[in-house]
């Protein structure tokens, strides 16, 4: 079992970076820091080169579409839009879903944080503004309730963070 952990610039990975193939490659909110869509695609392609024949790449990244859905609802209720950090380019689900990757295929997208974002960015934000006359507070009980609901997916379209699972072709 190869259980080495490496810290590299993912945009500079090429065919000579590794001498071996991997069962799993995991990215957690890293590819979203690549600020060009094509370079994000290239990064997924390049990482996919290093998966073994039955390998999986698990990417937990922010979703532009989930963020847009949250903001559409926030605007309806007079809440400010939430802008992504300047150092992130959230995944465009349409691009990721429809792109013809050469060596991996997207097998599943899991919107595991939908309920959390729905409650904290919409329900609680409205409650704080309309009834408490205060800004949302991460220590509020509704934040804790929302965290306990993560994974239930009552509200799939509001997941700002999703898991994208790719399998070696």
Identify what each model region corresponds to.
Residues 33-46:
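A short, conserved alpha-helix within the catalytic core of class I
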Residues 85-109:
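Short alpha-helix
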Residues 56-81:
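Conserved class I S-adenosyl-L-methionine
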